[in-house]
Amino acid sequence: MHVLMLSWEFPPVVVGGIARHVQDLSLALTRQGLEVTVLTAGPGEAPPVEKLGGLTIHRVRSENPRPLDLVGEVMQLNLNMLQRALGLAAGGRRFTLVHAHDWVTAYAAKALKHGLDLPLFATVHATEWGRNNGLHNDLQRYISDVEWWLCYEAWRVICCSHYMREELRRVFQVPEDKLRLIPNGVYPEDFA
């Protein structure tokens, strides 16, 4: 099995908890015998391709003019991720499924689901509604719409807490049989 994971955060790009989650999940999957390719945003100082055992990280860089706003930046990242994934597929890489993390990767995830005929799994770490205690402007409504759309397109929607599962059911009406609760893990030795 070969998982194509999409995340805008992956070390050294660490903004919140998604980077650590995706890194630890990817490494855990490789220890289980799966092959994992992560597509992520890449700063100039990070290697464009990095291998860690069965994990391969592809960091895509912006090759287009600098975007004017957040939505333009997200679209550009998705186009660059899509271009890299299609290049890997054209070069013989055979992926088994796409796993998208949060709304930022939704466009590339949907295109790969349909373009390569792959199952799509999505982990929703937080919602725009939850981050802002409601939706108060057009950008927040847009992001929430993309989050709903990602949940709709996904074969399975993964969340990390009971709270988030209930929020996804309430805000996006995600059916219970589509939701999977997989709590974040810890390394007990870090607390010894």
Region annotations inferred by a language model:
Residues 42, 163, 185:
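Carbohydrate-associated surface elements
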Residues 55-89:
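A short, charged, and often flexible helix/loop element on the N-terminal side
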Residues 98-99, 153-162, 182:
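A short beta-strand/loop micro-motif in the catalytic core of glycosyltransferases
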Residues 100-105, 124:
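Short His-centered aromatic/hydrophobic patch
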